[in-house]
Amino acid sequence: MLFRARGPVRGRGWGRPAEAPRRGRSPPWSPAWICCWALAGCQAAWAGDLPSSSSRPLPPCQEKDYHFEYTECDSSGSRWRVAIPNSAVDCSGLPDPVRGKECTFSCASGEYLEMKNQVCSKCGEGTYSLGSGIKFDEWDELPAGFSNIATFMDTVVGPSDSRPDGCNNSSWIPRGNYIESNRDDCTVSLIYAVHLKKSGYVFFEYQYVDNNIFFEFFIQNDQCQEMDTTTDKWVKLTDNGEWGSHSVMLKSGTNILYWRTTGILMGSKAVKPVLVKNITIEGVAYTSECFPCKPGTFSNKPGSFNCQVCPRNTYSEKGAKECIRCKDDSQFSEEGSSECTERPPCTTKDYFQIHTPCDEEGKTQIMYKWIEPKICREDLTDAIRLPPSGEKKDCPPCNPGFYNNGSSSCHPCPPGTFSDGTKECRPCPAGTEPALGFEYKWWNVLPGNMKTSCFNVGNSKCDGMNGWEVAGDHIQSGAGGSDNDYLILNLHIPGFKPPTSMTGATGSELGRITFVFETLCSADCVLYFMVDINRKSTNVVESWGGTKEKQAYTHIIFKNATFTFTWAFQRTNQGQDNRRFINDMVKIYSITATNAVDGVASSCRACALGSEQSGSSCVPCPPGHYIEKETNQCKECPPDTYLSIHQVYGKEACIPCGPGSKNNQDHSVCYSDCFFYHEKENQSLHYDFSNLSSVGSLMNGPSFTSKGTKYFHFFNISLCGHEGKKMALCTNNITDFTVKEIVAGSDDYTNLVGAFVCQSTIIPSESKGFRAALSSQSIILADTFIGVTVETTLKNINIKEDMFPVPTSQIPDVHFFYKSSTATTSCINGRSTAVKMRCNPTKSGAGVISVPSKCPAGTCDGCTFYFLWESAEACPLCTEHDFHEIEGACKRGFQETLYVWNEPKWCIKGISLPEKKLATCETVDFWLKVGAGVGAFTAVLLVALTCYFWKKNQKLEYKYSKLVMTTNSKECELPAADSCAIMEGEDNEEEVVYSNKQSLLGKLKSLATKEKEDHFESVQLKTSRSPNI
């Protein structure tokens, strides 16, 4: 039992009573007994029982002069029906108050409570009633009772907000049949308060396709306390074009309903708003009147609980019993119109061309058709006519894997055969197998596993239309019914599996889908590429806005599941009555899916044969084995190589691992086992990063959006080990979907990503007023390990020297390089990551992870991410070069040798310090004493001898001087000696010379014996020779 609220009279304010008031009138607010006595007094005054201020008698009241309403319910659940005079009416003799229906009474749908007799009556034609409910399905303007409150950083934003990027312009926007949420990063609440006399429920329909907006619905009481904190307030995502429904039970009393959205804008892409329509609230008391049908609708039966929409080319006014038809030749109208519109002259935007299926002659015709429904006129001035159809062209060949059997259609090749589309299907040669998949590059008819559709969230103009049309060498978006239609193209593939020879492989990639496209737009068109896994939920993988040149995009499939790939094209997101962007379109030239289950083959590839006999059927190779070309037998890949996921034929299918890496057991991936070796200046450095193999985390920020929303970048890094498994996990916690799926062990959850490096955006709880921090926008930064080296460049990934501070030691940094196999519009080669491991003995344990100061988000271009990981665990293992020995003193015949680390110590673990060494030795104390004594004695002796010889020398000098003086005095007294002349020619043969000099030995002897043997000194004087001697 519901009553329908429309326009400004539908809503109820905060704390209003439960009864639905009559239009333009307010119910009483006082308690029942006060109201009764007050009205009785008024009636007595009007009847003349009490003194009146005017002596003029009042006319008696007629039924048209007053209306009935109920008082508030008292504590016993009772109320009174009282008569209330209409405004600007003066009369006397109002009916007395009578006891009313119980407070929980209500009428059925299609009925109203006739207050005079207090009985339920059916609504008449042109009106409707919802009984004890209230419904909001008209959103031309915000209905009465609803309010918008925009908040930012827990601050209510009012009209006085003068910030240029404030939230004063953020609100829910009525769009006719639905209401649309904000698109910015403000928090906007759509609020409605209702007072229920009995338990009921609230029900609404919604579209919520973009997880960059947080959408929550919750209920509070009149004390602003949540009614049920255990209820999940997060609304689940819906598929594109799907209207989901949400309902919550309501308790009796005041219920304040909140539809709250918060946009998270971290990039330049615009978010898709939340849409809400058909809000129904059950549990209000009664309605005292039926409501007329809104314009564009009608009700032709008594007791209706809703109104029907007028069909196309008809219209109706308010309260209509039937719809009036427009003039067929000159007017038209859409469904639910309140008036007819004149038909405009036809233009080139009113028709489109298609290609007919091939006929038996292999020809296709170009046909021109008016856009349906046709609303233009050809008979007006300046109107164009439809171009002639029927021009024939040669049909394109069949798509690869299909053949033409002489009919006008193409058929898939039987299993085990292949065709390029121009020839008959042929069986694959011995030793080969079909390369299954789909390759659509000719578009004469829509393939059997594809379908197209059109929908609009605000109308049903294009329901049943083809969203896309084939056009020979491409397929293009169709005309649709409005410029804001979603034109949908779906491709369904039941699963993916590797070739037979690779069945045992454990590689992550199972297949890939590639499409070539271009967009031609004059407005804000958008092409969405979406993926649905196992028919659970459709997620937008990538989108392109505006005009885009012809390009290819590849999406990799990592698991075997049922996939539905969707291309959705929208010319503009603003709905308009006239067509302005009909010529905006998207063209897809080819779609290729590899390794598709139930696919067809355009070629054959080599496979491994059984060893029993030549030409036997294909057999799967064990993991890590390739097919040898000479024998077509399986052979294991060499060490330190991994098997290509695209082909296994030939030894070249085994791709060498990068530096510092090794293959896992299955040769499916290369990984680092956390050990690294490097030669430096004839010294071998050994690193062991095992203690850093667990996931390292970094919370970077904070950063702020244009409106000031604080958020953080959260990174998880799985450095090495674990046999190459991706241990870093990032999740979105907007709903509890992830937790439930993880507990259940399902592989279908999409809110969780695993990689070597991943990133999430964290919104702190205080930033948006949430009870807990929110994690969203989880992306994979690295899912493939490239290598580890001390060099700063590896496979086009370069770490600039000024990216991080210069190290303080001579220990080289070790660099781990990764990449992501998923390409994006901004990173056509995928993302890449470099992790610089730096030895820092002061950072114990897991150490510290940081990002470049120049790139606080970890990346400067959005494609390459850099991290510096400092830890003592990043130091090399200790060797004999990292310590030195210290010898102690010899004590008691023993000597100790100690070993200590070099300072500062730049190594960990490795070898340990040797034990102290104890060796025997000769004590040096005694010899030191002997040496000291001998030295002292020698010194004294030398001093004594010096003094002695000095004294003796003084005496000798004195005696010599005395002797010389004595000799000189005697020579003076003697007469002169005669001399004999020597004649010329004679020889002096008798000349004898006696020396007075002694040798050194003689001197020593004389000194030793002089005192004892000779008390006289003899001095030989030199004299001239005389003849008497």
From Swiss-Prot:
GO biological process, one term: positive regulation of BMP signaling pathway
Spans within the Extracellular topological domain: 48-929
Annotated keywords: Cell membrane, Disulfide bond, Glycoprotein, Membrane, Phosphoprotein, Signal, Transmembrane, Transmembrane helix
Phosphoserine modifications at: 1018
Any single Gene Ontology cellular-component annotation: plasma membrane
Zinc-finger among keywords: no
Domain MRH: 672-877
Annotated disulfide bonds: 293-310, 323-346, 326-358, 674-720, 730-758, 827-863, 839-875
Transmembrane portions of the chain: 930-950
Cytoplasmic side: 951-1029
Family: Belongs to the ELAPOR family.
Name of the protein in question: Endosome/lysosome-associated apoptosis and autophagy regulator family member 2
Organism, as annotated: Homo sapiens
